[in-house]
Amino acid sequence: MHTSPGYSFAEKLRQELDTPLFNPLLKKWVGRGELDYEVYLKTPQLLSLQSGETERVAHDELMFQVVHQAQELWLKLASRETVELVAELDRDALWAASARLERVVRIVRGLSSELGVLETMTPDTYQVIRRSLGNGSGQESPGYNMFRKAAEGLALAFERLLARRGQTVLGIYRGGPDDLKRLCEQLLDVDEAFQGWLHAHFQLVRRTIGVDRSVKALDGLPTQVLAGRMTLPLFRSLWDARVELTASWRREGGHAPGASREGCMEGAMSAYAPPMVSGACPMHAGLSSAPRGDS
């Protein structure tokens, strides 16, 4: 095939993608905004929300906008699902809440994966895009602020549930009802996923503009302050319970590494209960000489 020196296959393809495409299976034109799929999802409006080809300051700006717009949509969904969680906890519908918590966890974990796409952008390219972002910062994100607010409401709903059941977080982990323990673990999954997303954002900032006291984000704050935000929990009482459990932990009642456990009922003694009566288990007598390091 002979082409002129100025012919560009890429340019031809780019132009084709900007026009309606004929789907031979459907025998219909897709992209005119007339098909049910396009009408329902409002694809003409959705796909026009990004800067046009001639408006972008860099090729990667399309990726930058798409990822951030997608994050806002997912955060909107996570926030609305969290509102439903509040309603479910308030009516003691723990099975329904458990299923919805799994959904929220998957959504928030997906946010971290999406940010990974932006890591393919080199820092010099981002510095070009950055000039056109004004003073914008992640703190201005409607989705981020919505989800934080929704999570606050969920934390209060959790407290109301515990009050109705006459339970505390610490008591639940010391032999309380299994359904509440499962709920605690799933709430922690959400919190851990959220903090993981914040950490992914921190790492993205680190590899694009750097993290240092001398490096200012667009809002004027040093990027170093992002490190502290990563560990701010959504459900503090669940994390505090870990600290309290460890503070009241007792070494007595375990088994010396490598020693026989014959005659000892597995799990018969709580790590937080008073020590067993001497002689209840033949292995308890020699524990004082056991190694004392966590591994």
Residue ranges and their predicted role:
Residues 1-295:
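Surface-exposed peri-terminal alpha-helical interaction modules
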